[in-house]
């Protein structure tokens, strides 16, 4: 059995089917993964995401430190409350982790790390922090709840904090003990609330009473897949650069003198051109796309499905894949020994309950 979050008893009381994920005991679903998925697309759902790593970086050199360790640039955060998404890279440009950073004040930032890389990330951050006047503090005293879906602003105003709906996307505010961010991992509008363990159960029950449906990891994965959001360990890892997984937009190349870790390797890749590109796939024959399946592109080469599954919104099998740069609009995917036709599209399928399918 993995570690339990502060909401473990709440999940059991609601009849959750539990599973282990990245060393944590978390809900897979509460009876119907499909119904939970649709609840987020059509109304509101809530997730226990307390397994994510919350880390505070503080000190006189907090900003210079993060400008060194992140490919994106926290100097872009013009005022407290702004947030950005980016990657920490190794010297070869490979992704150590993808994360969200919040600017609290000139001496304090908050990082949200992936659960599976938490200990590795902390070790790496501590090593990189040695030349800087900063502290890196994991906040193991905090829980985290994601409220997602078109009804989430109404529920947040009523339950989380009055005026929550006034937050702009990728901004955050501190209301008492609650750190409230207009962020998420579903492709829908929503909030992520970080708060003390002792308060988590009460907020969870209030959200439930206000109409938010409890959702598990299963729905979280199909929602993020439809939205084209990457999953660390599947869509990228330390052997994959941001340019090779469609995250080149998270790299801040200016100013040129900012020497972030991995910059030299990325510069070489940018000049020479990446041999691969990151795409979406729609399966045109019976079957289900799954991570690890081979992608065959006639007269070009081979690629690999990095994430795949059934889309409850589109009612089709979709996937994300890394394929040769010269790949056109069609390919075939090897499923149980047979090559199945697939259409190549841009790597996002659904946002705000709307189909975004766009042929490459």
Swiss-Prot record:
Stored Pfam families: GCV_T (PF01571), GCV_T_C (PF08669)
Q: Output the Gene Ontology terms for molecular function.
A: aminomethyltransferase activity; transaminase activity
Q: Does the keyword Disulfide bond apply?
A: no
> Which superkingdom is the protein from?
Bacteria
State the reactions this protein catalyses.
N(6)-[(R)-S(8)-aminomethyldihydrolipoyl]-L-lysyl-[protein] + (6S)-5,6,7,8-tetrahydrofolate = N(6)-[(R)-dihydrolipoyl]-L-lysyl-[protein] + (6R)-5,10-methylene-5,6,7,8-tetrahydrofolate + NH4(+)
- What EC number is given for this enzyme? 2.1.2.10
Record's subunit section? The glycine cleavage system is composed of four proteins: P, T, L and H.
PANTHER family according to UniProt:
AMINOMETHYLTRANSFERASE, AMINOMETHYLTRANSFERASE, MITOCHONDRIAL
Protein name (record) = Aminomethyltransferase
């Amino acid at each position: 059995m993995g570690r339990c979050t502060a909401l473990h008893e709440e999940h059991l009381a609601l009849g959750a089917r539990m599973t282990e994920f990245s060393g944590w005991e978390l809900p897979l679903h509460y009876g119907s993964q499909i119904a939970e998925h649709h609840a987020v697309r059509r109304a509101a759902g809530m997730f226990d995401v307390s397994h994510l790593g919350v880390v505070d970086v503080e000190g006189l050199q907090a900003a210079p430190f993060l400008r060194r360790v992140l490919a994106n640039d926290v100097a872009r955060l013009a005022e407290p409350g702004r947030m950005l998404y980016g990657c920490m890279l190794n010297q070869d440009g490979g992704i150590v982790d993808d994360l969200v950073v919040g600017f609290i004040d000139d001496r304090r930032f908050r990082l949200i790390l992936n659960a599976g890389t938490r200990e590795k990330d902390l070790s790496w951050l501590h090593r990189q922090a040695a030349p800087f006047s900063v502290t890196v503090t994991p906040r193991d005293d905090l829980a985290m709840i994601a409220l997602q879906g078109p009804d989430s602003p109404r529920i947040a105003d009523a339950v989380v904090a009055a005026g929550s709906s006034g937050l702009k996307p990728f901004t955050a505010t501190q209301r008492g003990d609650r750190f409230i961010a207009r962020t998420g991992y579903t492709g829908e509008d929503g909030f992520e609330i970080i708060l003390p363990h002792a308060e988590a159960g009460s907020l969870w029950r209030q959200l439930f009473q206000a109409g938010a449906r409890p959702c598990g990891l299963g729905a979280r994965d199909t929602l993020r897949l439809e939205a084209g959001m990457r999953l660390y360990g599947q869509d990228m890892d330390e052997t994959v650069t941001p340019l090779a997984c469609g995250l080149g937009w998270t790299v801040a190349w200016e100013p040129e003198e900012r020497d972030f870790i991995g910059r030299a390797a990325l510069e070489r890749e940018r000049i020479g051109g990446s041999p691969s590109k990151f795409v979406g796939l729609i399966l045109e024959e019976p079957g289900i796309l799954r991570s690890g399946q081979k992608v065959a592109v006639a007269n070009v080469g081979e690629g690999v499905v990095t994430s795949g599954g059934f889309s409850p919104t589109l009612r089709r099998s979709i996937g994300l894949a890394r394929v040769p740069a010269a790949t056109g609009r069609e390919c075939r995917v090897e499923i149980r020994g047979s090559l199945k036709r697939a259409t190549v599209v841009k790597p996002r399928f659904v946002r705000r309950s709307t189909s975004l399918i766009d042929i490459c």
